Amino acid sequence: MKDEKNRVITDPQATENAHLEFNDPRLFRDLLGQHDQHIKILQQALEVRIRVRGSSLEIEGDPLQTELAAQIIRQLYGLLEKGYPVYPSDVDYAIRILSGDSRAKLQDIFLDTIYISAHKRTITPKSIAQKAYIDAIRRYDIVFGIGPAGTGKTYLAMAMAVAELMKNNFVRIILTRPAVEAGEKLGFLPGDLAEKVNPYLRPLYDALHDMVDFDRARKLVERGTIEVAPLAFMRGRTLNDSFVILDEAQNTTPEQMKMFLTRLGYGSKAVITGDATQIDLPAGKASGLKEAFRILKGVHGIRFVNFTEKDVARHHLVQEIITAYERDENQIASRDLSEKR
């Protein structure tokens, strides 16, 4: 067995070399990353060896992985030539994108600027699904973004909303989510309305403050240009010329979802986000998000965009955590099924 293993390693057909030359020394340094961090990420993820020689790279490894590494490096360099600053996270995203679809063009995704945040950070899609989501929001009046935590569903929707507000395409932004932990009543909590509502809407405020500086956000909220409110407060209203975002939609009941969708007035757009695997409703209660998908998936003018763990845009461990939990849940479900038999 040991001899067989050695034979595979030394087989000239088992490895391939690629040589890449780069003309701009400054861009080449940016391509490598600080302390060659970008190269280290590529080596670890693709299991190839990359050597730096002057302003060139030598890649060695499995033929398919070597070609993939070369393609990723060429496209990252192309982004740098366009003035896009490549960070380690971008290398991770590039690996995921091109591993899933070798025909993908990083420039089509990463250079699609949505908004420049309060911290002067350019907000762009970071996966094929995120790009499809942004394109859907631009094109359709009602868009559902469904998938696990960390895929950028709410954050990108808010970036689009703020960008459209700043262009005067809408007169206000409305951010809402069901306060399921309080049964949408909020009556037993201490304090005035703002204090009661705040814990359930804090994630929306956090994302808002990442895009608009604190003082400006406060003024927009005070004027009613940006409204952050629990879903129950949407009842009986007609929302005209508004960009409306419903977050945590998996925790709506079918009645609440229908109520929300029928609030939409002239010149308005709605984005509904949620994770159908994270429902916190009481046992036996149907999810409005699941019902909406079943009822509306064929309706013209409504778009559903699905995300997976491959689209997770948080710390790289978040994707590993999601995958591990899903694997464990599947194992438990299989074991329970076997025991019933």
Segment roles from a protein language model:
Residues A118-I128, A136-L246, Q250-R341:
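Conserved helicase motor core of SF1/SF2 NTP-dependent helicases
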Residues A104-P125, Q130-K131:
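P-loop NTP-binding catalytic core
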Residues R51-F110:
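Interdomain "pre-motor" coupling segment immediately N-terminal to P-loop NTPase/helicase cores
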Residues K40, L46-R49, S55:
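Compact, well-ordered interaction domains used in eukaryotic information-processing assemblies
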